[in-house]
Amino acid sequence: MPRIATIGFFDGVHRGHRFLFAQLHEHAKHHQLTPTIYTFDRHPKELLTGQAPAMLTTHDERKALLQNYGEVIFLDFAAVQQLTAEQFMCYLKEQEGVETLLMGYDHHFGSDRLKGFHEYEKIARKIGMHIE
C-alpha cells in the first residue's frame, strides 16, 4: 500500500509530535495510505558536528513510542546526508512508495537545507508527490 510519511528524529514524543502523528493517521485513513514515520539510527547532529546531544529516550524506547503512531523505518543518516531535498524526496517516492509527505512547520531536510515549505512544495509537484 502507498505511504503517507513524516520525517524526523523524534526523541521523545511531545505535543507537537502527537499533533503531527494525529494528522498522519487521519490523512492515512481518509486516503487509504500506510502511516509511516521515518527516523534516524543516530542523531543527525552527532554526524554533522561530532557531538551527540543528550537523549531523552534510547533507540528501543523511541522505536516503541513511535510504533504507536505508524510503521517506523530507521534510516542510516550517514547514507542519506549528502542527498539534496529533491534527491531524498525522489528516493522516498520511488524506493519507499511515499505518495504524501507530512512536514512540521519548521522542518527542513536535504543537504541543500531549503529555506521554506514552498520550496519543498515545488519539488513535490515536479516529482508527483503531495506535501502538507
Task: Identify the role of each PLM range.
Residues 1-132:
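Nucleotidyltransferase catalytic core that binds NTPs
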